[in-house]
Amino acid sequence: MENIKRAQEEFKELIESEYARIDKMKQAEEATDFSKKEKIIVGILPGDGIGPIIMEQAVRVVKELVKDEIEAGKIELREIEGMTIENRVAKMESLPSDVFEEIKKCDVLVKGPMVTPRAGDGLPNLVSANSLLRRGLELFAAVRPIKIKDKGIDWTFFRENIEGEYILGTVSYTHLTLPTNSR
């Protein structure tokens, strides 16, 4: 019975935190109209592994595409440091709070790949930085439009990012095995 009570308490805390998150979203301000902003800050988060290599080329392309806006001061590209696996391991934080504060100052974020430690790779067990970013920034869905005109395909796929199978996030839960299940 004690395991059931503990599981109920943990599940209650989880549900209460989700309701608090939903209430916070309801109180959030309206979506930003970027056409009315004096300056748009684009955060550049290289990540690690091949991330910095990919991002170097992505930034090169972005700089060319919005060259006039950058020169006019309408767009600022701001590199955000501190999300390498080495830094995250040194701080023992998947998403260091100082880095997250810098990310939240940006209007747009261009993010490279980030390593998520796995069993056996010699790194400490850290939660996925990607999932923490999604949850922290309330990125509730990944939208993938697919159009192939000559085949008549015009589809849009929505992939849940922070609810559904992701609802538990970094919260652990109690797994109960009853004697009848272990025979």
Where are these predicted regions, by residue range?
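N-terminal phosphate-binding or glycine-rich loops at protein starts, especially the Walker A/P-loop
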Residues: F11-K24, A28-I70, E76
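Short, ordered loop/turn segments at secondary-structure junctions
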Residues: G47-G49, G82, M114
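Short connector loops at secondary-structure junctions
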Residues: G73-R88
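N-terminal glycine-rich phosphate/adenylate-binding segment common to multiple enzyme folds
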Residues: N87-Y173
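Conserved small/polar residues in nucleotide/adenosyl-binding loops
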Residues: T174-T180
